[in-house]
């Protein structure tokens, strides 16, 4: 059972995932870059973690962020890493 989820996406996609998590009583951590520091959707999350702008394409950064915040799983959202099989393998191998 997932209790805490890292959202590895931005903007409206992150909000849609967050809303679904709320319905399922799953805590949400949103990963973001410094460029998004002041985005309003971040205030909706239970927690946030800042990653570098390049991290949206580097799966290891999201895995490290999820582990540092006690997440059980990562939702890649749409685009970025969602279509990357190596990222899926990495997440699985790390027990997320």
Task: Go through each PLM region and give its residues.
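ATP-binding N-terminal substructure of ATP-dependent carboxylate-amine bond-forming enzymes
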Residues: 1-96
């Amino acid at each position: 059972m997932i209790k805490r989820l890292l959202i590895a996406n931005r903007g409206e996609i992150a909000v849609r995932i967050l809303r679904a998590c709320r319905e399922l009583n799953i805590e949400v951590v949103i990963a973001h870059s410094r460029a998004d520091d002041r985005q309003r959707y971040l205030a909706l999350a239970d927690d946030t973690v800042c990653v570098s702008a390049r991290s949206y394409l580097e799966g290891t950064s999201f895995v490290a962020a999820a582990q540092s915040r006690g997440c059980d799983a990562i939702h890649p959202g749409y685009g970025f890493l969602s279509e990357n099989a190596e990222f899926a393998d990495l997440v699985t191998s790390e027990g997320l």
